[in-house]
Amino acid sequence: MGVNKQRGNRPYNPPLGWIEIGLNVLDKYDNGDNTWIGMNNSKGEWCVAYHGVGRGKASDQVKKITGLIIDKTFKPGYWQAHSGCDDQYHPGKTVGEGVYITPNISTAEGFSGTSDINGKSYSTVLMVRVDPDAIRGCTDSGDYWVVNGTTDEIRPYRILYKENNN
């Protein structure tokens, strides 16, 4: 990565090489207070993370993304591989079950699958902001964050696409 940035007092790794489509999120939360989406690592700013949207046809991915954005249908995954780990951000607690996100775009890409559009293959990832108080992290893997509260603690704000080189 080589870039040393922070958002919400957590590492921020920009999605270099990805096409970004911004969502209209300004003034949509917190009675119009946009501090959560700040870019100065200031108090009240939320962390940046990525969420792979799974495999499937482009039309299926659009439906899934729409559900995640509009209906807030983030759901815990099946495996929950880190649920029993010690939580690095909340000493004395375990991570627990929840929605997996990552501060690493490459990790999210591994969970995004691909879709074909006009004969080209693309990966799709959601860029989200996450309430830093809601993040749980396994002490032995900084690549995975878990949010085990409500989906109000995860706010999508960009859709990312990248053409895969076959």
Residue ranges of predicted features:
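Active-site and NAD+-binding cores of ADP-ribose-processing enzymes
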Residues: 7-10, 54-59, 63-84, 109-166
